Curated annotation (Swiss-Prot):
Stated name of the protein: Histidine biosynthesis bifunctional protein HisIE
Catalysis performed (reactions): 1-(5-phospho-beta-D-ribosyl)-ATP + H2O = 1-(5-phospho-beta-D-ribosyl)-5'-AMP + diphosphate + H(+); 1-(5-phospho-beta-D-ribosyl)-5'-AMP + H2O = 1-(5-phospho-beta-D-ribosyl)-5-[(5-phospho-beta-D-ribosylamino)methylideneamino]imidazole-4-carboxamide
NCBIfam families (UniProt xref): histidine_hisI, PRK00051.1, PRK02759.1
Source species: Staphylococcus aureus (strain COL)
Annotated compartments: Cytoplasm
Length: 210
């Protein structure tokens, strides 16, 4: 990880945990230099417990550890934001977040739903069925849904179009899971294209030449 310049002159600095995937704020804890160094070394979040007066690895009792993905320091170098992958609920009450905030549904939520279904033993799961049938079945279903999107677009039925796009996206994420493609890879490719200069049609072949 990068070398961080954090001001520990007052002993403790606040450390905010944020879900790396959903960006939900999970909790607030405090770190001293030793806790921060241990977090870097172990790759899991370690706080300094003000009540216990000792280092405290988050989840050391419950097993609900917080794996570190990235660390950010604010402009004053006295507050830390840590992107984590939580291993279970963060709050001692059993809630995902200590702030009880609800995360809006997103494509990351859809990806996680597909992953959870793939790992489940639910024989009635449609996702599980598709993945068991394999790529040929999944691509066939995706093609059918994509065709339905085109049909509804031509018909101009907005409500039906939205419904079919939702179906298509679901099957796309099942296909991505089957191929081992994470949505972050798609985001990275889109970001690459977004930042690429002169990315205009003049660089490409004419359609009739494809």
């Amino acid at each position: 990880m990068t070398n961080y310049k954090i001001d520990f002159s007052k002993g403790l600095v606040p450390a905010i945990l944020q879900d790396n995937q959903t960006k939900q704020v999970l909790m607030l804890g405090y770190m001293n230099q030793e806790a921060f160094d241990k977090t870097i070394e172990d790759g899991v979040v370690c706080f300094y417990s003000r009540s216990k007066q000792r280092l405290w690895t988050k989840g050391e009792t419950s097993g609900h550890t917080q794996r570190v993905k990235d660390i950010h320091v604010d402009c004053d170098n006295d507050t830390i934001l840590i992107d984590v992958i939580p291993n279970g609920p963060t709050c001692h009450t059993g809630s995902q977040s200590c702030f009880n905030t609800e995360v809006p549904f997103s494509v990351q939520t859809l990806a996680q739903t597909v992953q959870d279904s793939a790992q489940s033993n639910n024989e009635k799961s449609y996702t599980k069925y598709l993945l068991t049938e394999g790529i040929e079945k999944i691509t066939k279903k995706y093609g059918e849904e994509a065709f339905e999107v085109v049909i509804e677009a031509i018909k101009g039925d907005k409500k039906a179009f939205v419904s079919e796009v939702a179906d298509e996206l679901y099957h796309l994420f099942v296909l991505m899971h089957a191929l081992g493609v994470d949505f972050s890879e798609i985001e990275a490719e889109l970001a690459r294209r977004h930042h690429k200069r002169n990315n205009f049609k003049g660089e490409r072949q004419n359609i009739e030449q494809w």
